[in-house]
């Protein structure tokens, strides 16, 4: 058990989902029902805070050797306050992530394929000394974050992963886009809604999620 200081009147609740070498930082509203908690928001964090949230998310996963995790932070102005960084089986249900669901499935597919084809395996040795050396140094906080991000990118072989995606999986994004726009995906959505919500709410939620996923298709077309 541990105690955390409260952060009053925060500007944004950032929930970042990290899958392998990729991270999506999303605006989260914990006070709302599950289907409304993720707000479709673009550039909702100040640039410096966005980079810090991204670096912390990657750092946590690399340090603990996690490949699928979410990290939660409260942001006040440019200040980032991590509050919960151990969600090693995060919720990625279509009825929760909605707009961000295609990205999550695509990232899972890319990372799994990359690991399977290249033979990449997680390292059992966590090399914590590398991270403690950064923490114990006289560098500024910003310089430490930059070095943590470098260590994380090296562990997840970010450059090699991106090259693999650009060459071996070059058509995957288009395939996923076509899938999300297809009748088969819509049938999956309808079946999920029917198995999740009571009958009198199903039409409402089918329309709700169709709208959000249609927005994703629009934003990722062309």
Annotated model-derived regions:
Residues 6, 73, 85:
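Short, well-ordered beta-to-alpha junction loops that form the rim of enzyme active sites
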Residues 64-67, 119-120:
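Surface-exposed helix-capping loop/turn segments at secondary-structure junctions
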């Amino acid at each position: 058990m541990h105690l955390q200081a409260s952060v009053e009147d925060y500007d944004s609740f950032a929930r970042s989902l990290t899958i392998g070498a990729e991270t999506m930082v999303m605006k989260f509203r914990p006070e709302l029902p599950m289907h409304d908690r993720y707000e479709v928001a673009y550039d909702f964090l100040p640039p410096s805070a966005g980079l810090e949230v991204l670096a912390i998310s990657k750092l946590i996963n690399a340090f603990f050797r996690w490949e699928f995790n979410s990290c939660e932070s409260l942001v006040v102005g440019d200040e980032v306050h991590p509050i919960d960084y151990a969600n090693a089986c995060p919720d990625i249900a279509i009825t929760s992530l909605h707009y961000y669901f295609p990205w999550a499935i695509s990232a899972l597919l890319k990372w799994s394929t990359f690991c399977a084809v290249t033979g990449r395996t997680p390292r059992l040795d966590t090399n914590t000394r590398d991270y403690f050396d950064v923490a114990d140094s006289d560098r500024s906080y910003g310089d430490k974050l930059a070095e943590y991000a470098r260590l994380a990118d090296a562990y997840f072989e970010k450059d090699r992963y991106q090259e693999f995606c650009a060459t071996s999986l070059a058509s995957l994004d288009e395939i996923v886009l076509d899938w999300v726009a297809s009748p088969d995906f819509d049938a999956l959505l309808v079946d999920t809604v029917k198995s999740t919500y009571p009958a009198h709410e199903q039409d409402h939620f089918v329309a709700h999620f169709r709208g959000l996923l249609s927005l994703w298709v629009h934003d990722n077309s062309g």
